[in-house]
Amino acid sequence: MIRRNNAVVCGFLFRLVSSFIPIILMVSNAYASDAKKGEALAQGLCAACHASDGNSVIPSNPILAGQHYSYLKNQLNYFQVKEGEDRAKRENAVMLGIASGLSSDDIDNLSAYYSQQKIKPSYASNIELAKAGELVYRAGDDVRGIPSCSSCHGPRGLGIPGQFPRISGQHATYTASTLTSYKNGSRANNSQMMAISSRLTEGQINALAEYLAGLE
């Protein structure tokens, strides 16, 4: 018979259950927001670049459909210059102009709307490059000190609500641009991604971007 330390078992179960509480709350918040109002905003403000349902057909503009509510909400807030600050946490001239006019409710509603849309994923066009990206995504690169991407974003790139964004099915052009921005410091709102991206070679960035575009 295997003997168990009840205190250890209870502690593990408590941590396990506790880890789901933020996710449940965020899902509840997404549905408590007014997605219909978000849809109206999306059609008026966002459709030209991201499409009305968030499935952008412009490779340099991200697909927003199916992205986590919490991630979308955070990014829209990062594009705003908050009181007491002289710049936005995430600098982008176009998004600064749009996000600056959004209220807190607008951000909630837009985030809820896009998170509830079904993604029409992009695709990999270079299979050999995608295979090279898969190796980095799943195993990382010990020599360069790069952890596996799947350890945070999951084996299918779906992320974890409230912690890590969905990255599968995203346009390769946008993903490569994002990783490059983290690498050169022009996007500085995530210290963890800046540290990891700084170790990626240009070839690894392009390979990862290609792999993620076709990951389902």
Predicted regions: what is each one?
Residues 26-42, 55-60, 116-142:
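Electrostatic cytochrome c docking/interface patches
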Residues 11-26:
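Bacterial N-terminal signal peptides
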Residues 46-52, 110, 146-155, 208:
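The canonical Cys-X-X-Cys-His
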Residues 1-14:
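N-terminal secretory signal peptides that target proteins for export/translocation
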Residues 36-47, 137-150, 159-177:
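Sequence context surrounding c-type heme c attachment/ligation sites in exported
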Residues 33-82:
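The feature marks the first
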Residues 57-64, 79-125, 161-166, 184-216:
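Axial heme c-ligation environment in periplasmic c-type cytochrome domains
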